[in-house]
UniProtKB/Swiss-Prot annotation:
Function of the molecule: Acts as a chaperone.
SUPFAM superfamilies to which the protein is assigned, alphabetical: Actin-like ATPase domain (SSF53067), Heat shock protein 70kD (HSP70), C-terminal subdomain (SSF100934), Heat shock protein 70kD (HSP70), peptide-binding domain (SSF100920)
Phosphothreonine: modified positions: 198
Organism of derivation: Rhizobium etli (strain CIAT 652)
Protein's gene: dnaK
Induction record: By stress conditions e.g. heat shock.
Protein's name in the database: Chaperone protein DnaK
Amino acid sequence: MAKVIGIDLGTTNSCVAVMDGKDAKVIENAEGARTTPSMVAFSDDGERLVGQPAKRQAVTNPTNTLFAVKRLIGRRYEDPTVEKDKHLVPFSIVKGDNGDAWVEANGKGYSPAQISAMILQKMKETAESYLGEKVEKAVITVPAYFNDAQRQATKDAGKIAGLEVLRIINEPTAAALAYGLDKKDGKTIAVYDLGGGTFDISILEIGDGVFEVKSTNGDTFLGGEDFDMRLVEYLVAEFKKDNGIDLKNDKLALQRLKEAAEKAKIELSSSQQTEINLPFITADASGPKHLTLKLTRAKLESLVDDLVQRTIAPCKAALKDAGVTAAEIDEVVLVGGMSRMPKVQEVVKQLFGKEPHKGVNPDEVVALGAAIQAGVLQGDVKDVLLLDVTPLSLGIETLGGVFTRLIERNTTIPTKKSQTFSTAEDNQQAVTIRVSQGEREMAADNKLLGQFDLVGLPPSPRGVPQIEVTFDIDANGIVQVSAKDKGTGKEQQIRIQASGGLSDADIEKMVKDAESHAAEDKKRREAVEAKNQAESLIHSTEKSLKDYGDKVSEADRTAISDAIAALKSATEATEADAEDIKAKTQTLMEVSMKLGQAIYEAQQAEGGAAADASAEEGGDNVVDADYEEIKDDDRKKSA
């Protein structure tokens, strides 16, 4: 039975794990790292780079290197958070055909789901390389506070990557699974997850294989990226103060500043001071300019203090919704790279009144939890029951634009809830059901997930028709809504697809694009491998021709030289063709066989001559000796 893998699709880094016997195991990627940067880059010649190779060239190709795209997934272009991000990233955020926020590279638009799919493909390939078999099914994690549109977009990304997404699981819940799988005694834990782009807090009761989420809260636009940008803004301001030059519009400089900010932030988690040194950051009429600045931990903490404080309100709300006090929390589990920051740990300690648990790897624990959930679905992990919740209230818009809740936030999923509504006007023959998600009292202030019409109602006075609206949330947190006229039995239902979102046709097209990209990538890799083999053969044949060319005929020498020239020409072509290189490599191997034969004969002749010489040299000094065979029995006696 093919393995189901667990993937933590992160804002900054992604990670893949699989069940290995009874334990979950993180799989190393082709570069030998346990996590992969969630970055995709497109070079000028159209080559696509994913992960570490994309990160390595980001400084020289800032406008075509896409990162932190998870923050845009499932969001409309007009979203205020998207507006904020537009001014902070070196690449272009554009309006997609469906009104969603898309990204642009080399003049071509990509949906965030497409870019996420490229990262998922890399995770899929990493797992396939380790397992030695095709992988087609996965469990993928999302921030607990993701709304329906964001969850659906993540599922779409999986489909584009060629994966059947068996389950979408919340990141804090996955972390709790990995942390508590071997815990038998009952505990109430808080999972504080501050990652690269999102923040989640979940309160769970765990024990004896049951993981019950009591409440969840968070902020889907708060994470390490914001900390980095805060530091970049400070560096830009300091440089302007000292040199009178504004680096804000210099995309190359901004990318270098971002890398330096991330590095400094990480260093300051273990040291009190670091130095940021960026030579030749820019130049003016007087010559090149360099940025050198000492940064203390205290300064960094003062710059990001409000960001850390923003995590407190969601924590308090989650405690309140779960009906517990901070003192009743037995353990606080830290997840996400930003939880390594001493200031964050200090705030968590003050809030919960206890030292947070640091026994799990914050970068890997979510992927491990996803792999455990994959094991549960596959039947490899027994006696585990996971009860998650919906993070936001769901309802419909009713008379006066009021948001009428059908399912309250923190309701255990899967769940189903029905409520009966009626018409607002006489002789109304159709009703529009507008489905929203959020906590505000007016529907317009919440996230509109989608809408549909129930038509064909018989003309009646207002208030008479009985329209039953049913919400059905599956274990992935994805919503299906139906409306039924009790009088006529007419029913209309939809799987909620965000008013933007990707249509089935869009997804199908992107799947085909991804497949053709995979074929292109394979072709490119084959060309590189063929080229490497060819260059190695050219080098060894040229050396042999130089050393032993006089041992073969003039015609053979010419044939070998011509074959070398033809193969060199094939490897140096702009669009290297793997099949052409392989054919010409084969030709060179065949024509150089006579050269190989000549080398072999020459070596044999040398070896024979050397043997004769040593026999002649040592002939007079040969000593004849008598020897006596000692049997094992005699040896034992003498011992």
